[in-house]
Amino acid sequence: MNPQVRNLSFALLLALLCFAAYAPVLNNGFIADDYVLLEWSDKLKQDFFFLFTVPPMNFRTTSIALYGLLKSVFGYRPEFFYAFNILLHFINAWLFSRLLLLTTRDKVVAFAGAAMFAVFQAPQEAVMWVTGMGETLQGLFVLCTLLAWLKRRYFWSAVFFFFALFSKESALMVLALVPMLQWQQRKKLFPPAYGILLMPVAIFVAVFLHTWSTNHFIQKNVYAIGPQAAMVMIRTLLRLVWPWLVVIVALFRIDLHRWPQARQFGAAIGAVTLTLLPYIFLTYSGYLPSRQVYTASMVFVWLLAWLYSQLRNPKLQMAFAAAFLTVNLSYLWFQKDRQFELRAAPTTELLKLLQSRPPTQILIFDFPYPEPDIPKDVSFLVPGWTRDLVGVHGTGESCTDCLILHWDAQTRTLVSR
C-alpha cells in the first residue's frame, strides 16, 4: 500500500476511534469549574497578567486563552468545546503514533499503541470535562517537545516545552522523559543540547517562586509534600494498569512460554511512575483524578503495545484487541458519560431555571459545589441575568424579598421553598 494512503487510512481510523469513544459527551453541559474558567478567559483578554493574580492558574494560561478563543467563535455552546477537546485527543493519538514509530521502528507498536490510547478510558476526565483540557493541551505540547527533540530540532523542542509548562506545572516531567528517550535510543543521557530545555524551566521556576505566597494549591495545602504521596502513587498505578497489564502478560506467557524482558518491562513501569510523580502530592484524594493520568496513559499503552506486538498467535492478538476495544468503549458510553451528566446536573438545572424566569434576586441553599463563583457565573449564559442576582447561602449573602431555591439531592433538581 502506498505510504500516504496507509497514513491517511490510519489517521481516519484513529479519528473514528476517538469519536466512537467520546461522542456521548457531545450533548453534555458545562460542569462546575468550567463556568469560572470561561469568565476568567474574558478577564485574560482584558489583562494578560490577570492569571498571575490567581496562581497557579497562570500555569493554565494556554487552556484558558483557548476557552476565550472558542467562546468568541462559538459562544457558550458546550458541544463545540467538547468537540474541540476530542479533536485535541485525536491529534495527540496521531502524534503519539509518530513518537512510537520514531523510537521503536515498529509499525505494529505504533498502530496498536495509538489505537489503544484513543479509546483507553483511564484518562477520560481530560477529554470529557472542559476544565480537563489543560491536560490534553499539556499532552500535545509534551509530545511536540519529544518529537522535536528526536528530530534534533532543539530550539523548537524548548519552545514547545515552554508552552507545556504554561499548560500545566506537571510538564516538568519532560526533564525526566528526555533522558529516558536517550536511554532507550542508547545515546548519552544528558547531551549538550539538554541545556536548552533548562531555559524555559528557569522562567517557570522564577514565576513559580514569585507566586508561591499566593498559590492557592500550596497555601491551602491542596498539594503538600508528605507520606501520603507514596500511597497516592501506589493506588494510582494499580488503578491505571489493572486489569490490562495482567491480561497481556498472561497472554504473553501462554503464547511465548516466557516472561517479558525485565529490563524493558521495568523501564516502562519506571517511565509511567515518572509521569505520575508531579501529581502525587495532592491531599484531597487517595489517588489521582483520571485527568491527571493522561500522559501516564500514553506510556502505559506503549508498554501494552510492545507486549502485544510480540504475540505470535494472531487469535490471541485479535482476542486482546477486541476485548480492549469493547470494554473501554462500553465503560465510557454506559458508565462514565452518566457520571459526567450527574456532575453537570446542578449547574445544568440552574441554567434551565434562569432561562425559564425573568431576572430576579435568588438565594440558593445546599448547592453541591462549595465555590460560590460557580452558580454565579452560570448567569453569564442567560441574557439579563447577572452575578449579583445569584446569591448562595453560607457566603454571608441574604435577602428579604427574593426567590429561595433549594438543591434536592435525591431528585437532582432545584426546588423553590
Give names to the regions the model predicted.
Residues M1-R417:
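Polytopic membrane enzymes that build or remodel cell-surface glycoconjugates and lipids
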